[in-house]
Amino acid sequence: MTIMDIDDHSRLRDLAVSLIRQAAEGYSPKYGYGSMSCAAYDTAWVSLVAKPFNGIKKWLFPQSFKFLLENQENDGSWGRQTSPVDRILNTAAPLLSLQRHAREPLQLHDVCEDGDLDDRIHRATLSLQRQLSDWDIASTAHVGFEIIVPALLNLLAAEGLCFSFKAQDELMKVNAAKLKRFDPEVLLYGKHKTTLLHSLEAFVGIIDFDKVVHHKVGGSFMASPSATAAYLMNASCWDDEAEDYIKNVLVNGSGRGHGAVPSAYPSSNFEYSWLLSTLLHAGFTAKDIECPELCDVAGMLENSFIEGQGTIGFARSISSDADDTAKAAFALNKLGYDVSVNEMVKEFEVKNHFQTYPSERDASLSANCNTLLALLHQKQVGAYQPQILKCVKFLTRCWWNTDGPIRDKWNQSHLYSTMLMVQALTEFQAILDQKGLPYGLNTVEMARVSICLFQGCLRTMLQQCEDGSWSHSREQTAYAVLTLGQARRLSTFKHLQSQIDSAIDQAATFIRLHSVDLAQQSLPEFIWTEKVSYTSPLVTEAYCLAALKVATSLVDNPGIVGESLDLGIPSRQRIDKYIWLFHQTPLFRSLPEWQLRASFIEGHLFLPIVNEHRLDVFPRKNMDPDDDYIRLIPFTWTATNNRNFTFASPAWLYDMIMVSVVDYQADEFMEAVAGLTFSEDLSMLVGLIQEVLTPYKTEPASPVTSLIDMSSVQCPRAKLSNIASGDIEEVRTCLRRFASFFLDHPAVRNAQRDDRATAWREVHNYLVAHVRHTQDNMRLNLQEQRRWYVSRNMPYFHWVRSNDDIACPITFGFVTCLVPYLVANPTVERAVIGNESESIVTSSDVSFDSVESKYYADDVCRHITNVTRIYNDCGSVVRDATEKNLNSVNFPEFAVTASGSEKQALRAMGEYERACCQAAFQRLEEASLQTATTEAERAKRRRRLDVWKVFLDTADPYGQIYVVRDFTARSVHVRETGIASTAKDVPLVSSSVPLVGGGPMLVT
C-alpha cells in the first residue's frame, strides 16, 4: 500500500491501520519484532563466531562474512552513514573479521586464500586510518563509543594492525573516565541488568563471560547480536539458545537471510511505542486507528509495563530506559489506558534532568522531551510540577547553549530534536494557558521558553528546500511538518500563519510524491543512532503519515497557545513600520518581508531578559528617557543571524545584544556623567580608568594603541579640581561595573592569554578614547572659528584610525573571547547544559593561531571601525554642528575634495574602507583554515568564521538605518553645556555599508 495522492482523512486512517497491522503481523511470541536496518559492525561480530563440527572448527555464519565481502566500498570502508564514528565502527569490526579470516580461513579457504583478501585488508586499513585521523571526539555523541572503539583498536593491535591518530589521547582519557567506574562484579555479574550488556563485545579479555549468562533473555544479551556473538566466542560452554537467537535474527531481521544483522533485535517496544505515539500526537484518535491489531500492539506494551514493574526498555525483559517508558506511557494513556509514570520518575529523575538510563555520560534532549510529554498527559498533571519544570529548564538550557543545529544522541537529524522540543514546550505553554499548572518560572525563564520555541519553528521554516522538503528526505521532512504544525498553534506566529500553511502544503506534496511501500523502501536514511546509525522503515512511515495528517487537518483557533504569557508582540502594522526601513537596505533588500517580520518577533522575545539586566552596569541617571534603541538592538542581531542561516546560539545572541546595550549606555555615560563630572580635569578621569582596569591587566603588558599623554587631556581652562567625592565614587562604581561586565565574563576569564589581553586593551582604549574625544570637542568649541579643527595637528587619516570610542573595537575584543567559548566548543556546551560547576570548564582555544590570521583579524577590526566612523559622520553632519560635536568634515583636508562634496568624499572613503574590510576578512578566512590539520578542525574554524560574519554583518544595518532615523539618545546636559562627546554609534558596531553587496542608503 502506498501513500500517493492522499487527500481525504479516511484514506489516511486506512493507511494508519494498515501500518499497525503490518507491525503486529511481524511479531514473534518468542523473539518479538524488529525492522531496524542492518549494520556492518554487528554483522562482522557475527561473522567471527566459530564452532566445532565433528571435531573440526568452522565459521558458523559464513553468509555474514560473504555479506562483508559484497558490501565493502571502493575506498575500503563499510557503510554510507555520514557520522564519522559510524564509519569507524563499521570499518574497524569488518577489518578485524577480514584479518582473522585471512589468518585462519577454516572452511572458507577458497575465499580467504585469494590474494583479493590482502588487498581488501590493505584498503580497509588505510580507510580506517584516514577516518581516525579526521575524527572529532568532542562532538561525538554515539552511545558507548568511548568503550567500543578502544576495545576494537586493541583487538586489531593484537592482530598486528596498529593505529595512531591525533585524538587518541583524548579518546583514551574518556575511556579511562568511563572504565574508572567499571566493576564487573557489580555491573555485569550481579542480578541487576545494565546497558553494558548491550556491548559485551567491548569487554573481550576483560570479563568472565561465564558469569553473565544469567542475563540472557530469549537467547540474547540485551537484544544485541554483537554482544551475543562475543558471548558465544568467549563462553567456556557452547550455548545453543544464543546460537538459535542469531540464526533467527539472520532470517527474520531486516537482513532476511542475506547474512546481515541489525545492531538490535528485537526492538518491539521501541518501534511499537514510536508508531502509536507518533500517530496519536499528530491527531489520529483511538477510534481512527481502531482494529484488532491495535489491541495486540497496545497489549504487548502494557504487558511490558507489567513485567518491568512500571518501566520498560526497547524490548521485553531488558534494561528499562526513560525514553521508551515515556513514549509508551504517552501512547497508552492517549488510547485510554491508565499508565502511571511514578516508577519512571523514581528510577530516572536526577538533579537537573531525567537520565535515559543509569550512569549515562551525556543527558539526552529527546528523552527529556518525551518524558515531559508523558508528564503533561497525566490525569493529575499538577502532581508532577517539579518534574515538569525540571524538564522545561533542561530543554531550554540545551537549546539556549547549543551552537548551530541542536542534535541528540538517539537521532542525528537536528529536525528530530527540534520537533520534540517544540512539541513538548508547546504542550507546556498550552497547559499554562489552561491554568493546569502554576507558572513556576520567573520572567527570564519564561522568556527563554518562548525564544526556544520560536527559534525552533522559525529556523525549521527557513531551511526548507525549493522542492518543499528538508534535506530531500521524507522522514526529515515529516519531522519539519510536525514542528510547523505546532507553530500554527503558537501566538508568536499569528503574523506568519500564511507562510506556515504554505510551507506545510509544499512539504506534504513532497512526501506524497516520494512515498513507497515498506517492502519497496529504497535509499534508507541512517539517522537513528544505536551503536551505529540505522533506519526503521516502520517508524519512518509512521512519521510520514503523521505529517500528512497534520497537513490535512484544520487547527482550531490557530495562534492562541501562549497568549496567557502576555508577550506583548506588537501588531503587524507596527512591526511592518520597523521592517520597512530595514527592507530598504542592501543587506536585507532581497529577503522576503515575512522573514524580517519573523526576526523582529524573535528579537522582541529577548526584551524581557534584556530589561531584567539593562541597568546592571549603568543606572541611567541624567540619560535620555527615550530608549527606542532597546527595541531595535535584538532585531539587528536576530535578522543577521537568520539571514544566512548561521543560527548562532541564543546564548551568543543574548551576549551580543547586551554588549550592544551596554556599549550604547557607556557612550551616553561617558558623555553625560563622566565627561561632565571631570570636564575641568580630564586627566583625573583617565587616572580613574587606569585604576579600575589595572587589576584585570594581563601580563606581559598588553600593547595599547591609544594611550593618552596626561598633558594632552588637560582642559584648556584647567584649574584646581573641585569634584565632589560622591560624584567621583559614582563614576568609579560605574566604570568598575563596566570593566567587570566585559572582563569578568566567563568567556574572557576562560580565554587564552592573548585573547584576554586583546579584550583588556580594547576596553582600556575605548574608555580613554572617549576622554580624548571629549577633549577634541572642547578644543573645537574654544577655537575662534569652528569650521575647521586645527587645535590638534593631526591628519584626518590618523584621527579616523585612532578613534577607539567607536564600539567596534571593544566589541571585537569581546567577540575574540566569546566565539571560541560558545561556538564549536562541545566541552563548554556540555558543562553549561549539564548545569555543572564552572570550575570543570577548560580554557577555550585561541581565536586565531597564526601571525597572519591575527594580523588580518586586527585589520578587519580597524577597517570596520573606520567604516563606522566615516558613515556615521556622513549621516550626522548637521546634528554634530548643532550639538557642537567634532565631525570628520571639520578636518581641514575636506576643503578640497575629488568627489564634489564633503559627503561624497566620505562615501568614497567609506566604500574604500568597506572594500578593505572585505579583502581582509577573505584573507582571514584563508589563513585560519590553512593551519587546520584535520577536517574536524577545519569544520570548527569554518563554523566560527560564520559566526564572526554575523558580527561583521550586524555592522551594516545600524549605519544604514541610522541615516534614515537617528536613534541616538542625547542628554539634556549636552544641550545645556555644549560639552559633547560623539555618542555616534547607535547600538554597537555601526556601519552604513553592507559587507556583502550594495551601497549605503544615505540622507543627503
UniProtKB/Swiss-Prot annotation:
Domain of life: Eukaryota
Binding of Mg(2+) 1, residues: 667, 671
GO molecular function (one): magnesium ion binding
Chemical reaction(s) catalysed: (2E,6E,10E)-geranylgeranyl diphosphate = (+)-copalyl diphosphate; (+)-copalyl diphosphate + H2O = phyllocladan-16alpha-ol + diphosphate
Positions with a binding annotation for Mg(2+) 2: 667, 671
Required cofactor names: Mg(2+)
A Gene Ontology BP annotation from the UniProt entry: diterpenoid biosynthetic process
Keyword Phosphoprotein: no
Extent of motif DEXXE motif: 667-671
PANTHER family reported for this sequence: (E,E)-GERANYLLINALOOL SYNTHASE, ENT-COPALYL DIPHOSPHATE SYNTHASE, CHLOROPLASTIC
The record's note on its domains: The DXDD and DEXXE motifs are important for the catalytic activity.
Name recorded for this polypeptide: Phyllocladan-16-alpha-ol synthase
Organism: Phomopsis amygdali (Fusicoccum amygdali)
Name of the gene: PaDC1
